Amino acid sequence: MSRANSIAFQFLNMIVPPNTNLKMKPNKSDLHVVDLLRESVATGNPCLDLSYERLGNTGVLFLARMKDLSHLTQLNLSWNELTSKGIEVLAQCGSLAGLNTLILDANEIGDEGMHAIAESKTLSCLKTLSLTKNQIGDSGALALIKSANLSQLSTLDLELNQVGKERLTKFPDGTAIASLSRLNLRRNQIGDDTILDWLQTGAFAPIKHLNLGWN
């Protein structure tokens, strides 16, 4: 194993909680992740596609804390087995300040991860955010739509989530993002009550293109 990989795994062993099953000695899969991230970032391409790589939270933690990502404008982390823990790290990554497109489809991020993105000071340049199939309910969806930090967001994709599954009793304060013109809520669990609640809270106010198909 190269010295660079050795340093990388020393870092991974430091950040992984002691109660996890991650091996202390790297296997071929671990080496692939480290090499993949190093090679992908080293190209300098502003569009980084890491979809289907099964990085997990630990891989994203390594990416966010060990790599300079300031050249990125687009990042695709779909199908990577991410939870809210990985997203919390990503949302705090200072070198992602120039990111305008973030694709996180088919993970397990949930409402907690949505709140982390909504509260992020780093991701303020995001214009497109795709979150298809991520176990997101009304709380997480509305946190994004009313985020004071995501002031440039124009497209939000929440297809195949859990919006409408459980009716909220408390709604977030503030107004919907003024620049948000496209909202995809296709294939959720939205009924008349959810639509009425969202209308009353002002969530649809700036929307010009709304997809409510298959609800």
Regions found by a protein language model. Name each.
Residues 192-214:
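Ankyrin-repeat and related helical/solenoid repeat scaffolds used for protein-protein interactions
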Residues 22, 29-31, 36, 168-171, ...:
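Intrinsically disordered, low-complexity linker/propeptide segments enriched in Ser/Thr/Gly/Pro
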Residues 55-64, 82-91, 109-118, 136-143, ...:
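The leucine-rich repeat
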Residues 2-85, 105:
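LRR N-terminal entry segment and analogous cap-like coil->beta motifs
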